[in-house]
Amino acid sequence: MNVKGLTPKDLEQYGIHDISEVIYNPSYDLLFEEETKPGLTGYEKGTLTSLGAIAVDTGIFTGRSPKDKYIVRDDVTRDTVWWADQGKGKNDNKPLSPQVWADLKSLVTEQLSGKRLFVVDAFCGANADTRLKVRFITEVAWQAHFVKNMFIRPTQEELENFTPDFIVMNGAKCTNPNWKAQGLNSENFVAFNLTERIQLIGGTWYGGEMKKGMFSMMNYFLPLKGIASMHCSANVGESGDVAIFFGLSGTGKTTLSTDPKRKLIGDDEHGWDDDGVFNFEGGCYAKTIHLSKEAEPDIYGAIKRDALLENVVVLADGSVDFDDGSKTENTRVSYPIYHIDNIVKPVSKAGHAKKVIFLTADAFGVLPPVARLTPEQTQYHFLSGFTAKLAGTERGVTEPTPTFSACFGAAFLSLHPTQYAQVLVKRMQACGAQAYLVNTGWNGTGKRISIKDTRAIIDAILNGDIDKAETQTLPVFNLAIPTALPGVNSEILDPRDTYADKAQWDVKADDLADRFVKNFDKYTDTPVGQALTKVGPKR
């Protein structure tokens, strides 16, 4: 299966030698054979399920390993990367010396040497002008399958002239014995070198490290060119109107952007340039815990031949128990985006977004179901990236847990968060886009805002009804909230009205305002952040 132009000798430039065979851009049928062939053991082995998809296990790493993420600090990155050891904000961009990088690289290249290797060339980014051409090198068939699903698959013609911009070498089977002496976190590593344009993976089998690794790189390169790089879902209406949905896990990002009246551009990673909004990916990576055909027919229907399940429980008859989270609650499936019917074709991109929606699930019962944001408030709430979860009852704790994640994706930011906020607002202002804060969480009744009301709110945003509505100002947070919207229970629009005693809201609002102010302090080390404090909550 050696395709013209790629031989074992071509991989020697990366330090990999004595390769017995290169399996280049394998077909799905060949990957199926390789994943299920007799003799495979451990985490290399794929299991055929009754749905037609292959299931694999990723071992102890059932999610990303943020404590093992490093970026080489050199002349290219020293003054651009948002470093973990600088400033007030916490992030995962730990610096790595060029010397330690060389050691890690030699571990991975030795691991891959002397083997049959799978090489997948793919694009990250649907826009030809700004996409990254990525070459993935691995000895494990299902890892090649994962990136074939998740990244954009080139045509045969595009492959003939494919010169990679970035190399990902996945040495999941190797670990670093010298990590303590090198001052690293553990024997596992996910390391990036922006001068060499290489990502190295060692010790972790989790497929998402390759997906989110390239997202972190797009988050480095694009904003420096004035292009927004966003952790969001996006869809488009029949008239070409584009909406983007930001939100942390559990806020309804996937649910609310999956709309039978609108076509999906993508579910997780997007850019926004002079032409409009475009998907970075060629697939979806959906959570499957408690998945049912009735509740999420699109995702369930996508789990068929060529889909790849991770860490699910497969029963003796080949059926999948999606309710069993004994391996992890973070069970996943990757599949090519065309497994979903209602998508933008043939390329996952559309025009400029006119509606930008920040989803939050406020468990404190303070924020309104919807508010219209000013450009300054847009930056403030984008940088705050707030959501909150109800505490687990098993520990008997009733206090909600707040989460603040810059730009609704702090784990993947390579530059300072204010750079993403500035680029987003510039893009919005250039095309007259409007931002809204939508709370899918709880209010004074103690119940979660109904999905019916939330969907009606999203409809009012998308069809423009909200922009015609009368508004009032919610105190403390100074948010413009509508007094009435079609199809929405008017009694919930002002969160104070959901409390039997409005003084209760006042107390909770002051408490949450303090948390916002305290969190935002980390951005006051830049002039942009300092200026935005004036639009934050005021007690």
Curated annotation (Swiss-Prot):
It comes from the Bacteria. GO terms for cellular component: cytosol. It catalyses: oxaloacetate + ATP = phosphoenolpyruvate + ADP + CO2. The keyword Disulfide bond does not apply. Keywords: ATP-binding, Cytoplasm, Decarboxylase, Gluconeogenesis, Lyase, Manganese, Metal-binding, Nucleotide-binding. Pathway: Carbohydrate biosynthesis; gluconeogenesis. Its EC number is 4.1.1.49. Substrate binds at R64, Y206, K212, R332. GO terms for molecular function: ATP binding; metal ion binding; phosphoenolpyruvate carboxykinase (ATP) activity. One of its GO terms (biological process) is gluconeogenesis. Binds 1 Mn(2+) ion per subunit. Pfam families: PEPCK_ATP. Mn(2+) binds at K212, H231, D268. It is found in: Cytoplasm. Belongs to the phosphoenolpyruvate carboxykinase (ATP) family. Involved in the gluconeogenesis. Catalyzes the conversion of oxaloacetate (OAA) to phosphoenolpyruvate (PEP) through direct phosphoryl transfer between the nucleoside triphosphate and OAA. HAMAP family: PEPCK_ATP. This is Phosphoenolpyruvate carboxykinase (ATP). It comes from Proteus mirabilis (strain HI4320).
